[in-house]
């Protein structure tokens, strides 16, 4: 493992901008509004050859522990456990505030080395704040501008004596780990995104899987803003072995007309982006509300993106008429998602843990189908049988000739059908072939792409 460096500070001092600067990507949402970050976010950082894991945290606020800001602070405090260094960030232009002083008192009680950073130090406006920062008791602050990348060399000099040797120790282990990883199929890490409407229990579900309060939860809708990726090992009780999973928690997605807040728009866009990087997407429903139109829109979006889809009815422990609810949702899904019938539907409880092993088992199975490749010979044997059972129509008395089919890609499975006059092939016959591929060749409820290709007419102008 790399050395771990966490970023701590009050809201809106530029912690997420610093995080993005160090990882070299815009992974964390950034806005002028304070309190954008709510959950811890991890990233691989490299600073002038110094490699470490950087952790962005929620802004530190002096609030009651039962409130949302109070629970965010508890998450930030928990991030100190196991950290090698803490970057304590203040706003040089604002100077030292009473909340900065409170954070400093807390950090002085910790055994974690502290690097004080005076962010927003570009120009002369930050000079008084840099001078004030000495009063916090952590020595000379690193004058920095996360927005413009100024002060990277000074930060490197501050971190090198604290994690440089640890990085050298880890490098040897890393080389061994890389050698071991080369023996594994890269498909073995399941990239699993959790999506759904706000307050469906997505973060509670992930916390139950992990066995810790890793993500903020509560009755307030829309707590999660960033898409948070967590690498984790699931113990498969059937195999009696651990299997690697990358869990991706996303912001709740409401109807577009209801999304007026700029931050929520950023969060929904981030959730859509997370789906792109997932292999399997679990759409979480709230059993107390059932299936709504917005759920079908989210499911359709996942299918359009070509991801393997599963539906999990959460809060099953408080569902009324469970049997009727399950059957009603099953029927509505089959009618509303005609392009992918038989999507896996599971009843779970993020609070009690009911059905979670079954959920992970089904996720690995549908990912295997999503990644499957059928040999061309076997594919065309099925194709010949399908044509014999139901020949293509002959519009206007002229026969549509279907020659052969091949699988062009996987993840999602994509097939190319070759023939003549394919522009006149009815959509119903195309669906017949897609459903046959899914049913007969073991693709289950995976989205299938079928491209029609006719030979070019050499005499056409």
From Swiss-Prot:
Residues spanning the signal sequence: none
UniProt keyword Nucleotide-binding present: yes
Binding site for GTP 1: 9-16, 56-60, 119-122
Domain KH-like: start-end pairs: 372-456
Domain of life: Bacteria
Keyword Cell membrane carried by entry: no
Gene3D superfamilies reported in the protein's UniProt record: 3.30.300.20, P-loop containing nucleotide triphosphate hydrolases (3.40.50.300)
Molecular functions per Gene Ontology: GTP binding
Residues binding GTP 2, per UniProt: 196-203, 249-253, 314-317
Any one biological process term the GO annotation gives: ribosome biogenesis
Subunit field text: Associates with the 50S ribosomal subunit.
Family recorded in the similarity comment: Belongs to the TRAFAC class TrmE-Era-EngA-EngB-Septin-like GTPase superfamily. EngA (Der) GTPase family.
Protein name (record): GTPase Der
Lineage: Bacteria, Pseudomonadati, Pseudomonadota, Alphaproteobacteria, Sphingomonadales
């Amino acid at each position: 493992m790399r050395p771990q460096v966490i970023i701590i500070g009050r809201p809106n001092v530029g912690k997420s901008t610093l995080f993005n600067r160090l990882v070299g990507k815009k992974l964390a949402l950034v806005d002028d509004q304070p309190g954008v970050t709510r959950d811890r976010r991890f990233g691989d950082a490299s600073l002038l050859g110094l490699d470490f894991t950087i952790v962005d945290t929620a802004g530190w606020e002096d609030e009651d522990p039962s409130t949302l800001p109070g629970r965010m602070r508890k998450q930030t405090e928990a991030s100190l456990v196991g950290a090698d260094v803490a970057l304590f960030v203040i706003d040089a232009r604002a100077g030292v505030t009473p909340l900065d002083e409170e954070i400093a008192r807390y950090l002085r009680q910790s055994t974690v080395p502290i690097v004080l950073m005076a962010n927003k130090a570009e120009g002369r406006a930050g000079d008084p704040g840099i001078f004030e920062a000495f009063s916090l008791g952590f020595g000379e602050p690193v004058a920095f501008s996360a927005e413009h990348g100024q002060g990277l060399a000074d930060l490197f000099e501050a971190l090198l004596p604290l994690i440089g040797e640890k990085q050298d120790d880890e490098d040897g282990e890393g080389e061994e780990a890389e050698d071991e990883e080369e023996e594994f199929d890269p498909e073995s890490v399941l990239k699993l995104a959790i999506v759904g409407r706000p307050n469906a229990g997505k973060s509670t579900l992930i916390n139950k899987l992990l066995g810790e309060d890793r993500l903020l939860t509560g009755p307030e809708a829309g707590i999660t803003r960033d898409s948070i990726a967590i690498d984790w090992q699931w113990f498969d009780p059937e195999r009696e072995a651990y299997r690697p999973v990358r869990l991706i928690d996303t912001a709740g997605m409401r109807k577009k007309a209801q999304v007026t807040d700029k931050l929520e728009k950023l969060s929904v866009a981030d959730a859509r982006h997370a789906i792109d990087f997932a292999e399997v997407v679990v759409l979480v429903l709230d059993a107390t509300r059932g299936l709504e139109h917005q759920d079908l829109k989210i499911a359709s979006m996942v299918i359009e993106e070509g991801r393997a889809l599963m539906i999990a009815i959460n809060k099953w422990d408080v569902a009324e008429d469970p049997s009727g609810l399950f059957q009603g949702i099953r029927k509505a899904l089959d009618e509303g998602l005609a392009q992918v019938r038989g999507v896996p539907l599971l009843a779970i409880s993020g609070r009690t843990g009911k059905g979670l092993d079954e959920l992970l088992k089904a996720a690995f199975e549908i990912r295997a189908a999503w990644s499957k490749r059928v040999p061309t010979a076997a594919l065309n044997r099925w194709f010949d049988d399908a044509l014999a059972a139901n020949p293509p129509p002959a519009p206007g008395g002229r026969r549509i000739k279907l020659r052969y089919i091949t699988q062009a890609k996987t993840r999602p499975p994509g097939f190319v059908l070759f023939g003549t006059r394919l522009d006149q092939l009815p959509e119903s016959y195309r669906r017949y072939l897609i459903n046959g591929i899914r049913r007969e060749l073991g693709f289950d409820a995976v989205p299938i792409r079928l491209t029609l290709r006719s030979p070019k007419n050499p005499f056409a102008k």
